[in-house]
Amino acid sequence: MLLHLHVKNLALIREAEIDFAEGLNILTGETGAGKSILIGSMTMALGGKVSKEMIREDADYALAELIFETDRPELLKRLSELEIPVEDGQVILSRKLSGSRSICRLNGETVSTAVLKEISSMLIDIHGQHEHQSLLNKRKHLEILDSYTHETLDPEIGRAHV
């Protein structure tokens, strides 16, 4: 579950903090209110593409951090394999952009953008207007079902339906 977003020096945002509630969270607002910038900051923290032009004009860097709480065994196993410490089931994704450089961190440990993307794909799936590609992937359907039941379906069932 996504718990918190922290953004600093990104586009028009000097600094912002958002706490998320359990369940569905919806960003709404007038045109130009900053919804796209917030989604962009999440994308940045998740390892997505971001332009250095997004760094606030009066700043040297932009920072985006997301805090998640998870008990998903496959995610915790992968973090253990990567030697990323996890306390209280919290996973903190952080990305700092300065000039042409990008520094990614998972729970304070420096990682590559590829690793950040791998872990983030196990934590969240962001869908904007007309963005639903992962829902078209049949393999993703089983992951979604497994996440709701907190069990992994028998591989034979998976093969029969994919």
Where are these regions (language model features)?
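Gly/Lys-enriched N-terminal cap/neck module of very large, oligomeric protein machines
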Residues: 4-7, 11-144, 151-159
